Amino acid sequence: MKLNTLQLENYRNYEQVTLDCHPEVNILIGENAQGKTNLLESIYTLALAKSHRTSNDKELIRFKSDYAKIEGELSYRHGTMPLTMFITKKGKQVKVNHLEQSRLTQYIGHLNVVLFAPEDLNIVKGSPQIRRRFIDMELGQISAVYLNDLAQYQRILKQKNNYLKQLQIGQKTDTTMLEVLNQQFAEYALKVTLRREHFIKELETLAQPIHAGITNDRETLTLDYVPSLKLSNYEANQSELIEEVLALLNDNLQREKERGVCLYGPHRDDLSFNVNGMDAQTYGSQGQQRTTALSIKLAEIELMNIEVGEYPILLLDDVLSELDDSRQTHLLSTIQHKVQTFVTTTSVEGIDHEIMNNAKLYRISQGEILK
């Protein structure tokens, strides 16, 4: 999977720009606040129909403009395809091969990306919400079924929370509706939990040898998915598992009514990274946390290739120069001649010479690409 061209109109600080992309490495160089990260963000947004930097799409529209447009031509093993995203202050429109997609779940997955930025250390040391979002963003790109199940779960969760709040303040007294919601909730909570569990096991299998290689076998990395729905046997059949989830929800019905909020489900789950058996969030050094984050990102690249048959595009936002020689070497061995990569940096100093030899350089200044 490659991005051949990227066209922006009224996106962030870009009025109009076209990027003819190198099939291997694209290095965007410039001072801070010139628009390098905005270019990377536009690729991410084109892939996932949302930015990783803001939840407000209006911020993506250039100052004093009415719309923003991102268009990219992709090449796959079997041909090319344009993707388009049109953003206004009223909403957004996405197209695949010039055909408008009525649902984002039909759109996401045509362009797969892996982003590695300084804030990705928060995957290890940040809040559970950050780790859940990481799982959903990566898993959502490779499984349309998961995206749909997650959307259904979130819809039912919102309904359940609204009803619990009404029970808490006395606007409702009948719990029959809650029982109906719990039945639907249990079904989709289980689907989301099981798919996440499977995804983390696959990711761990790929991340372990990468982490061992970076640390010269001094460290062992393990991943543990930590569900709030503690089930006795995940290998049981679907109906038995749903009954177990329902039993747990019923046992805690009074607590949820008193709190006015749903206390169990995938929206409360977490992911633990362990280095040599110790929690990296609590006990890991910054170097160990950085190595863990890099191992996970490189494992994502391989997993996406396994699942969809195409390597994703790698976006490196101001992190390459921060990686030491060992980490850069492992990054290079993963991406070389396989993964199209976009890199932002203020200086090419410290970047591996082999990466530079297979790269195209773009100088970015005040929202323009200098020739």
Swiss-Prot record:
NCBIfam families given in the database record? recf (TIGR00611)
- Write out the GO biological process terms: DNA replication; DNA synthesis involved in DNA repair; double-strand break repair; SOS response
Its main localization is: cytoplasm
Q: Which UniProt keywords apply?
A: ATP-binding, Cytoplasm, DNA damage, DNA repair, DNA replication, DNA-binding, Nucleotide-binding, SOS response
InterPro entries given in the database record: DNA-binding_RecF, DNA-binding_RecF_CS, P-loop_NTPase, RecF/RecN/SMC_N, RecF_2
Q: Which residues cross the membrane?
A: none
Q: Which HAMAP family match?
A: RecF (MF_00365)
Q: Give me the residues that bind ATP, please.
A: 30-37
Gene Ontology cellular-component terms for this entry are: cytoplasm
What Gene Ontology molecular function terms does this protein carry?
A: ATP binding; single-stranded DNA binding
The protein's location, in the record's own words, is:
Cytoplasm
Q: Which family does it belong to?
A: Belongs to the RecF family.
Its biological function? The RecF protein is involved in DNA metabolism; it is required for DNA replication and normal SOS inducibility. RecF binds preferentially to single-stranded, linear DNA. It also seems to bind ATP.
Signal peptide (UniProt feature, chain positions): none
> Any idea what this protein is called?
DNA replication and repair protein RecF
PROSITE patterns given for it? RECF_1, RECF_2
SUPFAM superfamilies per the UniProt record, alphabetical = P-loop containing nucleoside triphosphate hydrolases
Which organism was this protein described from?
Answer: Staphylococcus epidermidis (strain ATCC 35984 / DSM 28319 / BCRC 17069 / CCUG 31568 / BM 3577 / RP62A)
